[in-house]
């Protein structure tokens, strides 16, 4: 299975990756699903909604600042790094992710499409103000702040620039993801349940256009029925080995011209 996946990637004209919470769980970031999704006695799904923010913005921001602190302590794992290396080699053209943790960029991936936003970005609920807290150098000061964050432009509340339950995905990111999927001849799916739509359409678009689907996951998912190659295992263990095999194939090809 690994050998077949490596051949598909090494021969790909335009390969993309599609990642979900499973890849970041190995960096110690709790997923929204299962017992790990609990914070204080709340389920994440109860807090990650526009209604919850309207009702109690203090509570929602407390939850998101806790998540931000967790993510700031986390580091990209070998799977994130392997994907960045595959892009560096010219094998992967982009990483499309459902994660908001910014770990792909931390690992060195350059072309990252974030379908569900980025936890280190904030936006105003009233005007067009947006800020990337990492880029402005305010992230550590921001997570320590006890007051509700206000927009410096209009004074309204700031909210996390992420997609909450019941909200549509950002149109620009979704269009870019679908456009990449339409061009792709291989999609490498890593650590996603494949049940959150419309994001989960990405591998289906590749498949419908005659492309190949490689899946790396600890268990079967909503994507598995369309996968040409299914590799069961932890992404942090599988991906470095897959990278090594792709490198071997490409080195051999270069050697023999």
UniProtKB/Swiss-Prot annotation:
GO terms for molecular function: histone deacetylase activity, NAD-dependent; NAD+ binding; protein-malonyllysine demalonylase activity; protein-succinyllysine desuccinylase activity; zinc ion binding. Substrate binds at residues 64, 67. Residues 1-252 form the Deacetylase sirtuin-type domain. It is found in: Cytoplasm. NAD(+) binds at residues 20-39, 98-101, 191-193, 217-219, 235. Its main location: cytoplasm. Binds 1 zinc ion per subunit. Zn(2+) binds at residues 124, 127, 151, 154. The active site is at 116 (proton acceptor). Its cofactor is Zn(2+). Keywords: Cytoplasm, Metal-binding, NAD, Transcription, Transcription regulation, Transferase, Zinc. NAD-dependent lysine deacetylase and desuccinylase that specifically removes acetyl and succinyl groups on target proteins. Modulates the activities of several proteins which are inactive in their acylated form. Deacetylates the N-terminal lysine residue of Alba, the major archaeal chromatin protein and that, in turn, increases Alba's DNA binding affinity, thereby repressing transcription. 2 residues (Tyr-64 and Arg-67) present in a large hydrophobic pocket are probably involved in substrate specificity. They are important for desuccinylation activity, but dispensable for deacetylation activity. This is NAD-dependent protein deacylase. It comes from Thermococcus kodakarensis (strain ATCC BAA-918 / JCM 12380 / KOD1). The gene is cobB.
